Regions:
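N-terminal pre-catalytic segment of deacetylase/amide-hydrolase enzymes
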Residues: 9, 13-17, 21-119, 125-132, ...
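Active-site beta->alpha N-cap acidic-glycine motif
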Residues: 81-183, 191-200, 207-208, 303
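Structural recognition of the beta-strand scaffold that forms the well-ordered cores
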Residues: 116-119, 143-147, 168-171, 209-213, ...
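Active-site beta-loop-alpha junctions enriched in small/polar residues
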Residues: 123, 148-150, 174, 214-216, ...
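Alpha-helical scaffold elements lining the catalytic groove of polysaccharide deacetylases
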Residues: 128, 177-203, 217-264, 279, ...
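Catalytic grooves of carbohydrate-active enzymes
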Residues: 262-299
Length: 306
């Protein structure tokens, strides 16, 4: 019996040892599994967190895309340009008169009336503004002069003469920057307000709130900023390359463009720095008058278009 008992004990011990070994091997195998120790509850939590993070990421991306596209459309920069067809007929612009009107902006007047609206951009004074003013006075024509800071600083007496002779002075910004690159209202306001302040110091009166974008560069947000500041924006429907001091057009070249492309309701842009303009303006006004045109002011244009 004892012998049997010993053998039985040995057998049981051997079986138990084998069983323990198998359990250990099983534990080792289980511990090596990649998902070892992760319960169903933990899996559920991770899955929920993943879905939440994915949803938030998708929402953020969609919002960023939407804002990006909106900003791109809103901040799109333009250079004002014109397309001419038949001589004597109004051109087409980058934007239509109706599209510009919602920003209190204009590029042409009433195309059924033989009226010209004469404007000058004044970047600096080089001796040509005086003969221009003399010609305007001779023909009793009132024009609008868009001035920058430099012109106000260096030629205050010329500005006073403009006002005394019934002309309008508008805002061409202080530093003649590419305003389409400005997205801040504070920066936009400073460029226009510095002109306002200096003009009032010189003349004792507020500047007329007419704005012309420097270089013809603009964006829709710029036009809205100008409107929010109480300005009316004026582009043009007739101009020619008259601003290069070392490459001035001849009298014949100037007349070809300015007589051939004149049209009813034209807002004409000339530069007061042009030697050619200073020399030909008297004769040019005479020729336009002989063609049956009269001259109006921008405030008349704006009031008719309102």
């Amino acid at each position: 019996a004892a012998c049997i008992s010993v053998r039985a004990g040995q057998t049981v011990g051997r079986r138990r040892g084998k069983a323990d070994g198998k359990e250990k091997e099983k534990d080792i195998r289980e511990s090596r599994k990649p998902w070892s120790g992760i319960t169903a509850q933990k899996v559920s939590i991770v899955a929920v967190l993943f879905l939440v993070m994915y949803a938030l990421g998708a929402l953020t991306a969609k919002k960023a895309e939407s804002v990006g596209v909106s900003a791109l459309l809103h901040e799109k920069s333009e250079n004002w340009g014109l397309g001419f067809g038949t001589e004597g007929k109004p051109p087409t612009g980058n934007a239509s008169a109706e599209e510009l009107k919602k920003y209190n902006a204009y590029f042409i007047g009433d195309t059924t009336q033989n009226t010209i609206y004469l404007t000058f951009d004044c970047g600096y004074e080089n001796g040509n503004t005086e003969p221009i003013l003399d010609a305007l006075k001779k023909h009793d024509v009132k024009a609008t002069f868009f001035v920058v800071g430099n012109f106000l600083e260096t030629s205050p007496e010329m500005v006073k003469r403009m006002i005394a002779e019934g002309h309008t002075v508008g805002n061409h910004t202080y530093h003649h920057l590419d305003m389409s690159s400005i997205s801040s209202m504070d920066a936009f306001k400073k460029e226009t307000q510095d002109v306002e302040n200096l003009f009032e110091q010189i003349t004792g009166t507020p500047i007329t709130k007419f704005y012309r974008p420097p270089q013809g560069k603009y964006s829709e947000s710029n036009l809205q900023m100008a409107k929010d500041l109480g300005y009316q924006t004026f582009f043009w429907s007739l101009a020619y390359v008259d601003w290069y001091q070392d490459k001035q057009p001849s009298k014949e070249e100037a007349f070809k463009k300015l007589l051939g492309r004149i049209h009813p309701g034209a807002i004409v842009l000339l530069h007061s720095t042009s030697d050619t303009n200073g020399a030909i303006l008297d004769e040019l006004l005479t020729k336009w008058e002989e063609m049956g045109y009269s001259f109006g002011s921008l405030d008349q244009l704006a009031s008719k278009s309102a």
